[in-house]
Amino acid sequence: MTRENGEIRLVNETEIYCDAGVSLTKVCRFALEHSLSGLEFAFGIPGSVGGAVFMNAGAYGGEIKDVITKCEYMTADGTRGELNSQEMLLGYRTSVFNKNNCVITGAYFKLSKDSQDAVKERMNDFLSRRKAKQPLEFPSAGSTFKRPEGYFAGALIEQSGLKGFSVGGAQVSEKHAGFVINKNNATAKDVMDLVKYIQKKVKDDSGVDLEPEIRIFN
């Protein structure tokens, strides 16, 4: 869930703070406005800062762990705390928050000065690549599966003949098989049934286990 009125502010000349509910796209635009480089890779990634930290979001050679310095969190009993980047144990689509019951409330990013033109050019380049290859015209949670070692999830799904395959209103994108999209008022059950079917079909066809990149809450 994103909050477009959440706080984003400069901490110093090259560091910014943002509330966890702020959208990544808004943070990227704030960085551009202040001629700060480092978050261009995140421009166009759906979701919030908190979700990006939780999963160590990344694309095009960049990851949240490359720019985050610390985050603020709150435990189930209301206790507040901070973790530095090392303490967050950020890895491929994972963090320490995957294993505890904390809620991320804010994050600090250390960026670098660059010209607005250069930052904007990189942002637009990454967004153009996304538009060309990803189904941004439909709602989705982004890339559905983690990249299995030695393979690409989208290629395996396509090899199993599942491009365009639907369950209810959920569909394997015809543009990029690594995305499950909401094509027509999909329910959570539609999405989960489709994800499970994809996992079974790819396992049967290729012997590869696909692990969801999206976080599932029952």
Q: Which residues are covered by each model-predicted region?
A:
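Anion-binding (especially nucleotide phosphate/pyrophosphate-binding) glycine-rich loop
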Residues: 1-49
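Structural signature of FAD isoalloxazine-binding scaffolds in flavoprotein oxidoreductases
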Residues: 1-7, 54-85, 100-106
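Residues embedded in well-ordered beta-strands within globular domains across many folds
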Residues: 9, 40, 72, 214-215
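Gly/Ser/Thr-rich helix-start
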Residues: 22, 45-52, 59-62, 143, ...
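A gly/ser-rich beta-alpha-beta helix-loop segment of oxidoreductase catalytic cores
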Residues: 31-69, 75, 140
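Short N-terminal helix-initiation segments at or just after the protein's N-terminus
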Residues: 15-19, 43-53, 88, 118-126
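Phosphate/pyrophosphate- and phosphate-bearing ligand-binding catalytic cores of soluble enzymes
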Residues: 74-193, 197-218
